Amino acid sequence: MTPKHLEPITAKLRRAGAEVEEFDDAVRVRRTGDILPLKINTMPHPGFPTDMQPLMGVLLSVAKGTSTVTESVWDNRFRYVDELRKMGASVQVDGQVAVFEGVEKLSPAPLRASDLRAGAAMVVAALMADGTSEIEEIGHIERGYENIVEKLRGLGADISKVERVPAALEQAL
């Protein structure tokens, strides 16, 4: 990982009020106070990466004020917004633009990972909420993030994977 390649992301995080430290092969981000609202426009490289948009959307859902995200690269990238709303986020989507009105905190909820990026965003949102959230359809997450549960636990996250018996199989038993 080269921190220089993350410049569009780290610049936005700094603008949101975070402290960002760059090392040779790593970046450390710390919250230093209130999260400030942002305007984000996704762009092809070297602009703000569309793959980071759902994760930034989670951050903006608890920013102090109104943020806008314009998705210029992919259609349907805002599929995660319905899941954030289940957690109490205030987000309105009109075409390729999402407007986030920051709330004080997110609440736990049953969630769904509709794709890889949305799944990562739901994991972060669930970790931000006080209480237990369950995320279904985690295959997307596991495909894109090897050993995510163990890695997040290593960072201090209270996270676990629960194996469920499919309802149809459970009824047959």
Model-derived features: positions:
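Short, structured segments at the rim of ligand-binding sites
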Residues: 1-173
